[in-house]
């Protein structure tokens, strides 16, 4: 099979042959990328909006959600996102999917997490890279497109409900509330954050109850809000 890339000059290493006596060109010609099942890659973007300024307590913050028009999680609300094209960088995937599903374009996006539990999608093994963005609501217009049945700004709050401590782990539970009166969206999600103490801080966000928010997107939103709150505190 021909090489995936036209220019392979930066992959020669020392230029020696491998154990089978193959050059890089010969190795790539014989390589079968379909020998093993490959995971699919997607992006999901948490877009926050504010009016004039971002408050320290994130009061008045909104999140952009789309209503799914197809399976899985049909009828539920989700983050704008979708599958990466074969020759597309992930940052470009995030921007493209955001524009296709909501009409929002031209705003900076930042990669902040990866969600890869094997059972997060019934279609296939899907690993998603999470992005976040922040914009003044008056600077963007939202319009549902592609496979989104609807798109809307929803007020969003995140409060800590419970906390447990052990010598090795810290566990917190958050209540995420998402509302939009016009769309009759009033949902509550419960998300658990488990973090290992020490220099290597293994961290896991898990949805206990997602309400009408699709898949693990409530956990992604909570993680993004935590990060945004930290950034605001640093600036202010």
Give the residues covered by each predicted segment.
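N-terminal leader/linker segments that precede catalytic domains of diphosphate-processing enzymes
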Residues: 1-236
